[in-house]
Amino acid sequence: VDGHCGVTHKKSIDLNKTHYSLGLAANTYLEAGADIIAPSDMMKNTTKYLRKIFVQNGFSNSQIMSYSTKFKSHFYGPFRDVAKSSPQGFDRSSYQLPVEDKAKAIKSSISNAAQGANYLMVKPGMTSIDLIRDIKKETLLPTGAYQVSGEYASLQMLSKAKFGNYVDLLLESLTVLKRAQADFILSLIHISEPTRPS
């Protein structure tokens, strides 16, 4: 309701209640047959908490894809508008990362790896390409990139303004993420009709 990624109380995050809620949700998905859980909350020690819950509930082999380096970004705007999830009362700077702090961004992924994550991720993807190789080197874990709504919307707007072929723009944006050594890419890709590169 308030657009935050956790349970709030008096303009702050209640970490214990947030972890408890995430644990319940994750357990429901695992019981339904999910192999991988990908919590997007960016709260402190979520990966550690979920790993403990997995073991307690008999899901020791289930995997966690951590949103391990997720920035407080303006590129989430289109999604927030559609989902009506813009944060209310206070912003997300208490749990999402500042875009200017590379060391903190890498440290966050290292921490999630130590807590038991199986996969790591940078988000937004194209504004985080300088981090992927360093995170992989430090953690030895598969590290992916999330091409977020603002990135996707920019490709659509360039195409609609006749500044480029949509598929060309899309493929270039994804190729750059692969060049930056992303092991996997999450995207909002949608092609509504047959479209070919120019």
Model-derived features with residue positions:
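Alpha/beta enzyme core
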Residues: 1-141, 146-185, 192
